[in-house]
Amino acid sequence: MKKQFLTILFIALYTLFCSNANAQSSIQPNLKFGNPNKEEMSITTCPYDSSAKAMVLCSITDVSYIYAVNTFKIEYSIKKRIKILSQEGVDEANISIPYYSPQASGGSREAIRSIKATAYNMVNGKMVKTKMSNDLIFEERLDKQQMVTKSTVPQVKAGTVIEYQYIKSSDFFYHIDTWMAQETIPTLYTAYDVEIPGIFVFNLEQTGSKSLQYSQEAANRAYITNSDPEQTTRYSFKGNNLPAIKSDPFVWCPAMYANKIDFELRSINIPGQYYKNFTTSWQDIDEMLMKDEDFGDRIKRGNPLKDEMKAARIDTISDFKRKVAATYLLLKKKVKWDGSYALFGNSSRNVLKEGKASNADINFLLMNMLKSLNIKTAPMVLRTRNQGSLPLTHPSIESLNTFAVGIYENDTTMYVFDGSAEKGYLDVLPAKLLTNAHIVNGGEYNIMKKGAAKQSIIIKATLKSDGQLEGLYTSKYYGNSSLRKKASFLEAKDSTEYVSKIAKEMNANIQKYSLNGIHKYSPQAYEKIQFDKNIDMGDIVYFSPMMEKPFRDVPFTAEKRDMPVEFDCPMLVSYNMLVKIPQGYTIEDVPQPKILRSPDSNIIFRTQSQYNDGILSTMYTFHIKKALFFQDEYPGLKNFFEDVYKELDNVIVLKKISQ
């Protein structure tokens, strides 16, 4: 009897445990819009992400073709329900819908219509609906090609459920928008349905590490009144409990690794009547760009600063790099970078009149100027790293968002320039441009091989018997290290704020500070810091000679990783600290030299210490040879960094000599 009672009790407790464990994860959103259910209204945290400020309860996207005015169009029907979990999540009530709508009349375009939104709140135990009025919907032009529809759902606070829906119509029957299954907040349920007429032949690409339900079936639909149905294909994708796309310090574009669906039109095929191949090559892209008035025509134009260049006698400079640098510095006096990246340009006259411009406008002007010096240049079109990688196998203009400039000294030597690198140099570019590119009327080129960050640190210090450590820190920055150092200094409110930040990082008092080369267009910068700090003294002193590390802390601590590791660029840090030990102290045990390598030997760490004639010398070199490490390399990478930081955290033991 006792055994039977315990069995029943165990089953009851186990059932209760399972029901509690699965209570939140079993939330079923109401797929019919206009009436959130009780569970959706009462939920207070995301079942699988307690840090989430909001979550998508339900997102449904339907894509269909319609036939109108003798052509096909695409309609996107989007419906979404969001739960606001905390006050920090109320920004989800601000809705922005970008779409393509050129200023010029005529031509293909997109349009947004049928926008509706409602906020649902529980007030005194009853659900209160607040609909968004039309006066909360605004249209804004982003540029001459893009518009955005903005709206704000009213009465939104922590606990609110938001619903909104709209329809986007597109004249671009050959292009289906990328569908993102994941968003920047967790998604409880999402569905994507696409129906495509049989005459359109698409390639389907599905990416992401999370599992989606997928089905495909043949169907029929009449697109013209009183006509026979056309054969179609229906694709359906569903996802549940998808995590948020979160920022990561070692991933440039987290959305690139999220679950998403891409359709690429391969051909239009009407058997026996019509066939057209829509697969584009880089040759096609090159031809389109060079025919474009805002790209190819900008390259072909003359030099608007020819007289200024002649007056500056730039053509008489014999050194190639100095000649190019002098040309850019003349241009820089006329036009500053406005912080934006672009692929297409504006009128040279307007750019020079305005005095500030995108990197593209600056690049076009430099190409015009160098052409007058008989220096060959070529645009290198690319996609900045924060927007994802460039699809080299199926290129499209839509995948490009800017370009850099290849500058040829001769047939075998090319330098890369970009107008956004105001504090850089030839081959010294912002990290977001260090990616695969395509040279127009040329070939593929990986700008990353131009990127290298080098830093050389030498510290000479004296440790006094009262514990005062005084020294001179000297650091030389090269390449991308120089660019980052200059940017960091210039982003500070003033030099006092910047020096205070450095003092905090060094855990020292800074008596004198200088940074040379900060305003120069050069690949180098030089830093000098005169410092002092207190060391606890006694019969035994634990002294850490590593005042600077490649990264402030161990960069990788998570046991698992769903995304690759992307460093800004290859890097090399060399460090050497010389410390004069006070009289009356000695060092009995100096750490043995050590070499550590990552599993693929693409990161190497070397360290060595010596003690001679009262001088302690500690050095290390840290060399990252490649910038990208895939997920399967992460465990070895994590263990390697842990081992490196164990070495960097080692202390030297000083012992007082008995008198």
Describe the role of every protein-language-model region:
Residues 5, 13, 328-329, 353, ...:
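Contiguous, well-ordered alpha-helical segments that form the cores/surfaces of helical PPI scaffolds
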Residues 24-281, 288, 346, 361-367, ...:
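Beta-strand-rich, non-transmembrane domain signature
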Residues 170, 331-335, 644-648:
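Sec/Tat-exported extracytoplasmic proteins
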Residues 282-354:
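Secondary-structure boundary elements
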Residues 499-659:
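A carboxyl-terminal module marker
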